[in-house]
Curated annotation (Swiss-Prot):
Name this polypeptide is given: Uncharacterized amino-acid permease PB24D3.02c
Location of this chain's protein in the cell: Membrane
Family: Belongs to the amino acid-polyamine-organocation (APC) superfamily.
Gene3D superfamilies: Amino acid/polyamine transporter I
Length: 543
């Protein structure tokens, strides 16, 4: 396949960045592909393959995120912890392959939102891209908020280990949450070149965190805390609020799907990446695969060093089960030291998520999809979408008010983030299957492409439905799953705003809008708005 879709002539007289005619600066294949998709180059391409991988790997923040959400996977004993991770994470691989094909074909920061628009017929394009834009913004923003909440919980647990008399009020907990939100966001207002270096550094730091965690627990375990292989892989007990063991095991999938959600986030920074159509699919698949096996090792380590008193771990006074495991094996100082490293790693994870969220909001605002889009599509002189970053923080602060209700209410944001991500993942794949409009990029699965997408959609819909269920079999209004409330409000606002008479999105939103000047695109086919025929089944090779 040609390096660009629908490209009719080469560009040798276009200046990258300001897109002016008459300059002699070289134009890369990345710039040509972006031009063909209808967008001028606004970001600087500073992200190497390692940095792109670091964005996805860092967004997952494997070890600290797993530690912060461990309680969800402990509903079925040690065996349930270990196997729910392996099964849940493995089932995400078809999704990674399916999304990698789209990322390679359409490397733009709009990612899932743009892909949905591109793959849908003109009749449905505007509404579907509008809907997906809002759900995806909800997914990334809630993913950031839930990770900030996990970080705040880890900070409080560490403080409790260091000082057993420490007992923060819910308002103090909320204050820690807000402070962490701004602190983690501050890191990504720096220039793109720094962000690329930070992303690469984050890979090294996250891997070092994993090694520190595993080695410290394995080396310090005693006969009282060390468990046998039969216990690690074969102990199944029901500690959930449901009587059915099988359903309790399915609920354990919350940990792997939450921790690993965001593995495609590198697609939101492809306009800042070099050789984006290759780098994005490599980063998506490799980051998920590495996280799957490293996470499995972490789970085995925790299950092998937690002892047999599962109830005391679950009901720890520190608030975080893994904090109790660290204390039992390492003592106070060791537990605080390892927890400090986990907190730093989790904050880096939060920064990576905020980066992805702000880029998606910028891309959606660039296409006039948000109220006040002209505000959120602005870049600073350094090329940073500062207003979009502030919007992410505003949402995080508001949704964090659920902390003042109860733990069950705020815990629902974990489910909400996953559900929103899974809806966002599934919609472009459904369009790709129904309308057969994919022009394959450099990464393509050939005859296995459609079967992989079908399996991916089936798993996404199953998990999205499962995560709407409450944590308890007969919940009261306090124990209900609040995810459906926030998701329902978002869908209601999205659809209502779109069809609002005279002022709604239907009157002005047409889907992704090209930002390339006409004098630049002269002689170029930017065929996004035109109907097109898929090249997927023409018998040619696209690798």
């Amino acid at each position: 396949m040609d390096e660009t879709i629908g490209m009719k002539k080469e560009f040798h007289d276009i200046s990258v960045g300001d897109i002016e005619v008459g300059e002699s600066a070289p134009v890369t294949e990345d710039d040509k592909m972006l031009l063909n998709l209808g967008y001028k180059q606004e970001f600087k391409r500073e992200f190497s393959l390692l940095a792109v991988f670091g964005q996805s790997f860092g967004s997952m923040g494997l070890c600290p995120s797993l530690v912060g959400s461990m309680a969800f996977s402990m509903n079925c004993g040690a065996g349930g912890m270990v196997w729910s991770w392996f099964v849940g994470a493995t089932c995400l691989l078809p999704i990674a392959f399916a999304l990698s094909e789209l990322a390679s074909s359409m490397p733009t920061s709009g990612s899932l939102y743009f892909w949905t628009a591109y793959l849908s017929p003109p009749k449905y394009r505007a509404f579907l891209s509008w809907f997906l834009g809002y759900v995806l913004a909800l997914a990334y923003s809630t993913g950031f908020a839930s990770t900030i909440y996990a970080a705040a919980g880890l900070v409080q647990a560490t403080a409790s280990v260091a000082n057993p008399s420490y007992a923060p009020t819910k308002y103090e907990e909320y204050g820690i949450y807000v402070a962490l939100s701004f602190a983690c966001s501050a890191l990504i207002v720096l220039p793109t070149k720094f962000l690329a270096r930070f992303s690469s550094f984050n890979v090294v730091f996250q891997i070092c965190t994993i090694l520190i965690f595993i080695i410290s627990l394995a080396a310090s375990s005693t006969s009282e805390t060390r468990n046998t292989g039969s216990y690690i892989f074969g102990n199944f007990e029901n500690y959930s609020g449901w009587t059915n063991m099988g359903w309790s095991f399915i609920l354990c999938f919350t940990t792997p799907v939450w921790v690993l959600s965001g593995f495609e986030s590198c697609a939101t920074i492809v306009e800042e990446a070099k050789n984006a159509s290759k780098a994005a699919p490599i980063a998506i698949i490799s980051s998920l695969t590495v996280s799957l096996f490293m996470g499995f090792c972490i789970m085995i380590t925790i299950a092998g060093t937690m002892g047999h008193d599962f109830s005391s771990i679950l009901n720890t006074p520190y608030g975080e089960p893994v904090s109790q495991v660290l204390y039992n094996n390492l003592g106070k100082r060791g537990a605080v030291g390892v927890s400090a490293v986990l907190i730093i790693a989790l904050c880096f994870n939060c920064s990576a998520l905020c980066l992805a969220s702000s880029r998606e909001i910028f891309a959606f605002a660039r296409d006039k999809g948000l109220p006040g889009s002209w505000i959120f599509r602005k870049l600073t002189p350094g090329g940073i979408p500062l207003n979009a970053i502030l919007l992410v923080n505003l949402y995080t602060i508001i949704v964090g008010l659920l902390m003042l209700v109860n733990v069950t209410a705020i815990s629902s944001i974990f489910n909400l983030a996953i559900i929103a991500f899974f809806i966002s993942y599934s919609l472009p794949l459904v369009c790709r299957l129904l309308f057969n409009r994919l022009n394959p990029g450099k990464f393509y699965c050939g005859k296995f492409s459609k079967p992989i997408s079908i399996v991916a959609v089936a798993w996404l819909w199953f998990m999205a439905l499962m995560l709407l269920f409450p944590s308890y079999q007969n919940p009261n209004k306090v124990e209900m799953n609040w995810a459906i409330v926030v998701l329902g409000f978002t869908v209601f606002f999205c659809v209502g705003y779109y069809y609002l008479p005279k002022y709604g999105g239907k009157t002005f939103f047409k889907g992704p809008v090209k930002t390339v000047d006409e004098n630049v695109t002269e002689g170029v086919t930017v065929d996004f708005q035109a109907d097109h025929v898929s090249k997927e089944d023409d018998g040619k090779s696209y690798n």
